[in-house]
Design a protein with these regions (language model features):
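A short pre-motif secondary-structure segment
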Residues: 53-56, 97
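Short, conserved catalytic or interaction motifs in soluble domains
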Residues: 26, 67-68, 90, 129-130, ...
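Catalytic-core segments of nucleotide cyclases and related cyclic-nucleotide turnover enzymes
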Residues: 75, 93, 107-148
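PAS and PAS-like sensory/regulatory domains
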Residues: 36, 97-101
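Conserved long alpha-helical elements within nucleotide-processing catalytic cores of c-di-GMP signaling
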Residues: 1-12, 19-46, 55-59, 63-64, ...
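Residue-level recognition of strand-loop junctions within catalytic nucleotide-signaling folds
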Residues: 26, 65-69, 86, 108-109
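Short catalytic/binding micro-motifs of nucleotide second-messenger systems
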Residues: 46-51, 83-95, 125-127
Length: 148
């Protein structure tokens, strides 16, 4: 599979992972964990803009494909999503759960295999997890990772 860009904007892949999701499952149970995942998916779908598309990737991970003019614009989208998640509690039958996500953003270059783009975004996201969570990280074409 490859990501194809047919417009003048660049394509970016944002990989989101719910921080400490295992703790949610261990504390509240898998049913509440499932409610959290479904609710977050609904939130993400409502928060994405016309040039962004959200997908459930698996487990507690989501992918957002972002069309942006440049790296900075794509990074702003990542920060916006992380802040929205941080500012909206998930309501369930027993109350509310405050969650955060860590995001990794990578540009998808023309004809580049999807797994390569996901791998780069995953490395950026992992770096964000290792350096504190609840943040957005960008990985550039030289594989340099920076917090945004």
């Amino acid at each position: 599979h490859q990501l194809r860009n047919t417009e003048p904007l660049n394509l970016y892949l944002m990989l989101l992972d719910i921080d400490r999701f295992k703790l949610v499952n261990d504390t509240y149970g898998h049913l509440i964990g499932d409610v959290l995942l479904r609710t977050l998916a609904t939130y993400l779908a409502s928060w994405t803009r016309d040039y962004e598309t959200v997908y459930r990737y698996g487990g507690e991970e989501f992918i957002i494909i972002v069309k942006a003019a440049n790296d900075e614009e794509a990074c702003r989208a990542g920060v916006r999503i992380c802040q929205l998640v941080d500012n909206h509690a998930i309501t369930h039958s027993e109350g509310h759960i405050n969650i955060t996500v860590t995001a990794g953003v990578s540009r998808a270059f023309p004809e580049e295999p999807l797994d390569v783009v996901i791998g780069r975004a995953d490395r950026a996201m992992y770096e964000g997890k290792q350096t504190g969570r609840n943040r957005c990280m960008f990985i550039d074409e030289q594989n340099v990772i920076n917090r945004v």
